[in-house]
């Protein structure tokens, strides 16, 4: 029960429309975003600091940077997306499009690096995450 509570609190702090981002990740990786990528190790999940620890963590780092660049748009916005022939198509509204594209790029990156994702990083915070953060 404690684990469920921790996950619920974690979900409240995640930027972006988590459900839609999760659909993209599932579409591109075949894996559940929550079960396979939470806390991998420095940037996947809420917050982030230190240098990315692996290719998957780097995808999440780039995602965080993208949200930072789109600061004029509310990153928790719901947007329209669809899947056509394995391609993620984003809504055309400027802010929705910007946020959706941040999620889309991260999901594609995750799909390209699915083989490098290591289960040992699930809900794991590495000592390397305490090092100085890299710039976007």
From Swiss-Prot:
The family line of this record is: Belongs to the phospholipase A2 family. Group II subfamily. D49 sub-subfamily.
Single GO cellular component term: extracellular region
Instruction: State its role.
Output: Snake venom phospholipase A2 that inhibits blood coagulation and platelet aggregation induced by ADP and arachidonic acid. Inhibits tumor cell adhesion and migration in a dose-dependent manner. Abolishes the attachment of human brain microvascular endothelial cells (HBMEC) to fibrinogen (IC(50)=0.2 uM) and dramatically reduces its adhesion to fibronectin (IC(50)=0.3 uM), whereas no effect is observed on type I collagen, vitronectin or laminin 1. Also blocks the cell migration toward fibronectin and fibrinogen.
Query: What's the protein called, per UniProt?
Result: Acidic phospholipase A2 CC-PLA2-2
* InterPro entries recorded: PLipase_A2 (IPR001211), PLipase_A2_dom (IPR016090), PLipase_A2_dom_sf (IPR036444), PLipase_A2_His_AS (IPR033113)
Molecular functions per Gene Ontology: calcium ion binding; calcium-dependent phospholipase A2 activity; phospholipid binding; toxin activity
Q: Which SUPFAM superfamilies match?
A: Phospholipase A2, PLA2
Q: Which GO terms describe its biological process?
A: angiogenesis; arachidonate secretion; lipid catabolic process; negative regulation of T cell proliferation; phospholipid metabolic process
- Per the UniProt entry, the disulfide pairs are 42-129, 44-60, 59-109, 65-136, 66-102, 73-95, 90-100
Q: Which residues form the signal peptide?
A: 1-16
Please list the residues that make up the active site: 63, 103
Tissue localization of expression is:
Expressed by the venom gland.
Which residue windows are coiled coil? none
Q: Where does Ca(2+) bind?
A: 43, 45, 47, 64
Q: Which reaction does it catalyse?
A: a 1,2-diacyl-sn-glycero-3-phosphocholine + H2O = a 1-acyl-sn-glycero-3-phosphocholine + a fatty acid + H(+)
Give the miscellaneous note: Negative results: does not show cytotoxic activity on human fibrosarcoma and melanoma cell lines.
Q: Which cofactor does it need?
A: Ca(2+)
Q: How is it modified after translation?
A: Glycosylated (2.5%).
For whether the record's keyword set contains Disulfide bond, the answer is yes
Q: What is the cofactor note?
A: Binds 1 Ca(2+) ion.
For this UniProt record, the keywords arranged alphabetically read as follows: Angiogenesis, Blood coagulation cascade inhibiting toxin, Calcium, Disulfide bond, Glycoprotein, Hemostasis impairing toxin, Hydrolase, Lipid degradation, Lipid metabolism, Metal-binding, Platelet aggregation inhibiting toxin, Secreted, Signal, Toxin
PROSITE patterns, per the entry: PA2_HIS (PS00118)
Which compartments does it reside in? Secreted
């Amino acid at each position: 029960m404690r684990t469920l509570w921790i996950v619920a609190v974690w979900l409240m702090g995640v930027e972006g429309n988590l459900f839609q981002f999760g659909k993209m990740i599932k579409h591109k990786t075949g894996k559940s975003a929550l079960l396979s990528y939470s806390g991998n190790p420095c940037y996947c999940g809420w917050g982030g600091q230190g240098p990315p620890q692996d290719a998957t963590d780097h995808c999440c780092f780039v995602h965080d940077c993208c949200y930072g660049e789109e600061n004029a748009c509310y990153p928790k916005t719901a947007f329209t997306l669809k899947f056509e022939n394995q391609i993620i198509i984003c809504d055309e509204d400027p802010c929705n499009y910007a946020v959706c594209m941040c999620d889309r790029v991260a999901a594609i990156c995750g799909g390209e690096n699915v083989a490098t994702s290591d289960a040992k990083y699930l809900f794991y915070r590495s000592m390397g995450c305490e090092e100085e953060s890299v710039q976007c």
